[in-house]
Design a protein with these regions (language model features):
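Metal-dependent phosphoester/phosphodiester hydrolase catalytic core
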Residues: 2-7, 11-20, 28-556
Length: 556
């Protein structure tokens, strides 16, 4: 089902079927050179919100800020000054407090005689709430294309808040991933090498914040953020990362600290409360009596090292061997994903949600949680046997091997941490929260999944978003569009938890919640290779409560 987004359906100011253009910064009324990185807000509660900007000056400076109840700034409700300098990369981050619950506000900054563009923000509501609109975004890779989905989110009047579940930046060098294509469209990474130092991470964050579509979204909607892996390095765990080499890149602890410092400087997120560190980066937001959203920290505080399939490729000769791999490694007891502190905060959030009588409990989930095994794609005739080809695609070799032994698709996701997943489901059930809605990023694919624990008991549903620009796994691996679509269909057919998936399009998920129902719209971009694009509704699912719990159903 494909339908074009129009003014009446979602995107304000867009005629039916019309193309949109993410305009250059100067054409969109962006800030002057002093505020070249735009303005942003985020991490709100009922009476406060974080306001952010960065000033492009050569020496320490004092920056004024204003928060108003009107767009003309005639009714200033909060104002102040913030001193910034090179010790924080000239970023400005203030907590505007003493605000009204559910309030709508405008904000701006002033430095060296220059006033920034204004942004719009809001606080969390208290009490009765009839509707909530959230955009689910993930995997925004500057070098892989234009952030058209950000531009669409900025224009989308159904969106109240933006949840970004990680990979807000990417750490790789330009030539590590389609470098020639990145240069062709003017999207080479800065710096061009893989980032390792604090200066590197700051430079990369700065580049991403200069993007006009990113600036439009951040100025229009408050950001609710959590991180995944690429904010630091590919596939980290507590003791290192798959993409970190201590011999050439130094101590992992130093690199991780640099990435986290830059993240907190450049993102509109609160500093940790008493007794917490920046690494303990998880949040809970309460939306009146309608919903609670909790995010997870799954990379730095507790995660066990990922299972590596490579040593098993010669060791597995039977399905019994494959099940031994799952039993002894993937499902090994004690392989954590979440820290005890994060788990305790989740239980507290769910308990409070139930006490408020909220119908919805959401999880901002950095990586897929549904059980997803690879079908035997060679036996199904979807791809040829790599052994019969002189130069098979590397992805085809890996896919054929996983499919032959019916193995989990991504061992870096919850599929590689079966004990931790069962622990989370049991924890939710004990709190009366067996109807969770997981809002998931990481995979670069759209997903609609029904979840169950190891005993088959319903555990909620999962809505997964594709990348803002990061391409889907199959299409990026060299499979053509027809084969990629067949692989999507085979995954859904093979896995009881997968209702539908799509790896062909970049985009975001719009989730609209009301008291008795929800609607998830998978919004796709027809291209990320040009700033001129068309956004359309690729698929829709209603969230309804049935006899077996929370269900996803295509609207009639």
């Amino acid at each position: 089902m494909t339908s074009t987004i129009t003014r009446r359906t979602t995107l304000a100011g867009m005629a039916a079927g019309a193309a949109l253009t993410a305009l250059p910064a100067q054409a969109r009324g962006a800030p002057a050179r002093v505020f070249a990185h735009g303005v942003a807000s985020g991490d709100p509660d009922a009476t406060s919100v974080v306001l952010w900007t960065r000033v492009s000056v050569a020496a320490p400076v004092e920056v004024e800020w204003e928060l108003a109840a009107d767009a003309g700034f005639a009714r200033i409700v909060r104002q102040g000054r913030f001193a910034t300098g090179p010790e924080r990369d000239f970023t400005v981050k203030v907590l505007a407090d003493g605000l009204e619950p559910g309030g709508h506000y405008f904000y701006r900054f002033r430095a060296v005689g220059v006033t920034s563009a204004s942004g719009r923000t809001r606080t969390l509501p208290v009490g009765r709430l009839e509707r909530l609109g959230i955009a689910l975004a993930s995997c925004s890779n500057y070098s892989q294309g234009f952030f058209n989905a950000y531009d669409a989110i900025a224009r989308d009047p159904a969106i109240d808040f933006v949840l970004h579940t990680g990979d807000y930046i990417y750490e790789h060098g330009t030539d590590a991933w389609h470098g020639d294509e990145a240069r062709k469209i003017g999207r080479a990474h800065q710096p061009e090498h893989e980032i390792v130092s604090l200066s590197d991470y700051r430079t990369r964050h700065a580049q991403y914040k200069t993007d006009p579509a990113s600036q439009a979204m951040l100025a229009a909607k408050p950001l609710l953020a959590c991180w995944d892996d690429h904010e630091s390095a590919n596939n980290p765990w507590t003791g290192g990362a798959q993409a970190h080499n201590p011999e050439t890149e130094g101590r992992w602890e130093d690199r991780r600290a640099a990435s986290i410092q830059a993240y907190f400087e450049w993102m509109p997120v609160r500093e940790p409360g008493p007794g917490r560190t920046r690494m303990q980066f998880w949040r809970t937001w309460v939306f009146g009596d309608l919903a609670t959203l909790s995010t997870l920290e799954t990379r730095h505080t507790a995660r066990a090292q990922q299972v590596d399939y490579e040593p098993w490729k010669k060791a597995i000769a039977s399905h019994a061997d494959a099940r031994r791999l799952e039993r002894e490694q993937i499902g090994a007891e004690g392989r954590r994903m979440l820290s005890p502190e994060c788990e305790a905060d989740l239980t507290a959030a769910w308990t409070h949600s139930k006490q408020l009588g909220q119908p919805w409990r959401l999880i901002g989930n950095p990586m897929p949680i549904a059980r997803t095994r690879v079908p035997d794609v060679v036996a199904l005739g979807i791809i040829p046997d790599p052994a019969s080809q002189a130069r098979p695609l590397p992805a085809a070799v890996n896919l054929a091997w996983k499919g032959k032994w019916n193995l989990p698709f991504y061992p870096d996701t919850w599929d590689g941490y079966e004990w931790a997943r069962e622990r989370l489901y049991a924890q939710a059930r004990a709190a009366g929260a067996d109807d969770l809605v997981f809002l998931t990023g990481d995979s670069h694919d759209f997903w609609a999944n029904r979840l169950a624990d190891g005993a088959g008991r319903p555990a909620g549903v999962e809505l997964g978003t594709s990348g803002i620009t990061s391409p889907g796994d199959f299409i990026d691996s060299g499979f053509d569009r027809a084969t990629s679509a067949r692989l999507d269909a085979a995954l859904a057919e093979h896995n009881p938890e997968v209702i539908w998936t799509d790896n062909l399009y970049c985009g975001y998920v719009r989730l609209e919640l009301r008291r008795d129902r929800g609607l998830a719209t998978f919004v796709a971009m027809d291209t990320v290779r040009s700033r001129r694009y068309r956004a359309f509704a690729l698929k829709r699912y209603a969230l309804e409560r049935g006899e077996t719990g929370l269900e996803l159903r295509e609207p009639g």
